[in-house]
A protein has these predicted regions:
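Conserved C-terminal beta-signal and adjacent last beta-strands/turns
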Residues: 10-12, 178, 217-218, 228-230, ...
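Extracytoplasmic beta-strand/coil segments of soluble accessory domains associated
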Residues: 53-92
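Periplasmic-side early beta-strands and strand-to-turn transitions of outer-membrane beta-barrels
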Residues: 136, 144-145, 153, 165-260
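A beta-strand signature from Gram-negative outer-membrane beta-barrel systems
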Residues: 107-149, 648
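Outer-membrane beta-barrel signature, preferentially recognizing the C-terminal barrel domain
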Residues: 256-277, 319-321, 363, 402-407, ...
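Gram-negative outer-membrane beta-barrel transporters
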Residues: 376-383, 392, 478-481, 493-575, ...
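Short acidic/polar hinge/loop motifs at secondary-structure boundaries
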Residues: 63-64, 92-120
């Protein structure tokens, strides 16, 4: 009953922070009240390095946006890109590509992750721009004792990965170093077609097809280093550096591929505890991250027909982005309440480079904010109040009709849990949040609209958590009213809309060895008022999704059989160039065995039945290749087998 013990521990944590909604921290789902925890990302999610895929398989309200064999994106309760915040060790990192080739989730690998916490809704006041959710990724921490591990992984479609981690130190200083390298060929769908064969099957113009039909799909190398210096028992300094180097990532449904994606993340943090009556804990944090993303047609045919003698020069588009930020936060106990106040500031630059006519002119988004939280218990009732005031400038170097922007936002929320007893909890929250438009939405050469207002989200959430014996269920409802929602209708515009939905998750321990994990998520999105086009459905609102996993655990081994089922995508925005997708169900198998105290083995097969399906729709916010004015769909992987051998010490 290891999970039941974990559940009790997490319950205690949630009483201190009612707004924390999902945690990925080692993959066994332990949810309590308004929290979900998925554990052992680095140990369990070893099929590939793709964090987006790991999240979508373990959190019902997260859906995968597949663009390639790696570097995929996520949708959280019908929201994507800047509508959800992504933090890596409390640092922001943004992709540089306006076409989402390098989403924030692609800049960290699962083998380096200790935990991922997902807050659904407007219940985060500490970070700039959390409109409808925040994903907080925490990488591994250094240890005092010397520990390490080496992983060797191989899978279908030419996938190979090797990673190594070592950590150790003293009472005063600890250090961790982790590195990895991986590569993969073009995967094949359930019909046996790889990227090139899918292009040919869908009649993609010859000039857009790959010149080398056996071109590798991606190569990726990473480095993570972290250090911790303990000044004394109550004070510490932490430093980290994360490097990601990805080369030749193929995007077969687009007109270009990524020549490379290079990113760097630097963090410095200072923590002091028990400084006196006015400080229970003081945190000072600084981060800097940057991304360099050139994309081109270098790997395509670049001529009209196979017999054509004229080859076009490669088209190249290179963009860079960077952001630095700092935060000071102090917590103090006041009249049996925990009060937190803080200052937060950041500056993000985004620009197209190496061109006289940039698609995005160099633009700086500067935010300054003050925030506060109060956590208080009244008997069986636990409450958290939060508020944040933002002042944001957006300055552009645009030469023609430059329009700098200023935005002011006042946001607040309250979230509560009523504990009937140790097995029954009711929870509810209401809040308002906002996010400003980014440089692409304001100033892009073809789709930008410099008159955009910031988006406001007014949301309510309600649910309960009930355990009956060894059976647990956690249903949750949400209703979100979006004012001035930023929407791509060919050009960006503000519209009014609403998104509402339900998710249900839980577990059932049938015996000491058998257990069942389940989850379901459903959401709908509708436009209100005036909008371009005649379709009332919102784009990128995934259909009904269900997850069911049967586990059999013994002392040193574990068997898992999993089904992921998705309904047909028949509510879609045709005016935004989406289309109907068929439903599907995918069956996965996994086996792990601790062969020796130092050696572990994992075997798995995803999509056992070799199902052919497409999970991702074709919203016009992303540029897709078209055939007869129809955007081409891209099938997900067919049957995929993998094996991982781990040596730890």
């Amino acid at each position: 009953m290891k999970r039941f013990i974990s559940l009790s521990l997490v319950t205690t944590a949630v009483l201190l922070n009612a707004s924390e909604v999902t945690s990925l921290d080692t993959i066994s789902v332990v949810e309590t009240a308004n929290s979900k925890i998925v554990k052992d990302v680095s140990d369990e999610q070893i099929k590939s390095a793709d964090l987006a895929e790991a999240l979508s398989k373990n959190v019902p309200s997260i859906s995968l946006v597949r663009r390639s064999g790696i570097a995929n994106d996520i949708i959280l309760r019908g929201q994507k890109k800047d509508n959800i915040n992504i933090l890596l060790d409390d640092a922001k990192i943004y992709g540089a590509c306006p076409n989402r080739m390098d989403p924030s989730t692609s800049h960290v690998l699962t083998n380096n992750i200790q935990s991922v916490k997902v807050i659904e809704g407007p219940y985060d006041v500490e970070n700039f721009g959390t409109l409808s959710g925040v994903v907080k990724v925490e990488t591994k921490e250094p240890t005092k004792d010397v520990h390490g591990e080496i992983n060797l992984n191989a899978g279908s479609f030419g996938y190979k990965k090797a990673s190594a981690t070592v950590s150790g130190g003293t009472d005063r200083f600890k250090l961790l170093v982790s590195t990895s390298t991986e590569e993969g060929d073009q995967y094949k769908d359930g019909n046996g077609n790889d990227f090139s064969e899918q292009q040919i099957e869908k009649n993609v113009p010859y000039t857009n097809q790959y010149s080398n039909t056996k071109q590798k799909a991606f190569e990726k190398k990473t480095l993570l280093t972290k250090g911790q210096f303990n000044i004394n028992d109550d004070q510490e300094i932490k430093l980290s550096y994360t490097a990601n180097r990805s080369d030749n990532i193929l995007y077969p449904t687009g007109s270009m591929d990524a020549d490379y994606d290079d990113s760097n993340i630097y963090t410095v943090g200072y923590t002091a505890r028990n400084l006196g009556n006015f400080s229970k804990e003081l945190n000072l944090d600084y981060y800097y991250s940057d991304v360099d993303h050139p994309m081109s047609t270098t790997l395509r045919n670049r001529k009209m027909t196979p017999n054509s003698m004229m080859t076009m020069d490669p088209m190249v588009s290179r963009l860079k982005t960077s952001i630095w930020g700092s935060k000071v936060k102090n917590s103090v106990e006041v009249a049996d309440s925990l009060v937190t106040v803080g200052l937060d500031t950041s500056v993000r630059n985004w620009r197209a480079v190496d061109t006289a006519t940039p698609s995005i002119p160099s633009s700086d988004t500067t935010n300054k904010a003050i925030f506060s939280k109060i956590e208080k218990s009244f008997g069986k009732l636990d409450l958290e109040f939060g508020t944040r005031y933002d002042y944001t400038d957006v300055d552009t170097s645009k030469v023609v009709n430059p329009e700098d922007k200023k935005y002011v936002g006042l946001n607040a929320n309250v979230f509560g849990i009523y504990n009937i007893d140790e097995n029954t909890k009711y929870f509810a929250g209401v809040g308002k949040s906002s996010r400003v438009p980014d440089a692409r939405e304001l100033y892009h050469s073809t789709a930008g609209n410099s008159t955009l207002e910031q988006t406001k989200n007014y949301e309510a959430d309600v649910g309960f958590d009930k355990t009956i014996g060894t059976f647990n269920i956690r249903p949750k409802l949400f209703y979100s009213v979006l004012k001035d929602y930023i929407y791509n209708s060919g050009t960006f515009e503000n519209i009014d809309a609403k998104i509402y939905g339900l998710d249900v998750s839980g577990f059932y321990f049938m015996t000491e060895n058998f257990s069942l994990d389940y989850g379901m998520a459903y959401q709908r999105g509708k436009k209100d008022g005036e909008y371009t086009g005649n379709d009332k459905d919102l784009a990128e609102i995934p259909p009904l999704k269900g997850n069911l996993a049967l586990n059999y655990e013994m002392t040193k081994s574990k068997y898992t059989a999993e089904v992921v089922a998705v309904d047909s995508w028949d509510s879609y925005d045709s005016s935004a160039r989406e289309q109907e997708l068929g439903g599907y169900a995918v069956f996965n198998l996994k086996y792990t065995n601790q062969l020796h105290k130092n050696i572990g083995l994992t075997l798995g097969v995803d999509n056992v039945l070799d199902k052919t399906y497409a999970s991702t729709n074709t919203y016009q916010d992303i540029t897709y290749l078209t055939v007869n004015n129809e955007r081409i769909l891209f099938n997900d992987p067919g049957r995929y087998g993998y094996v991982n051998l781990k040596y730890s010490f």
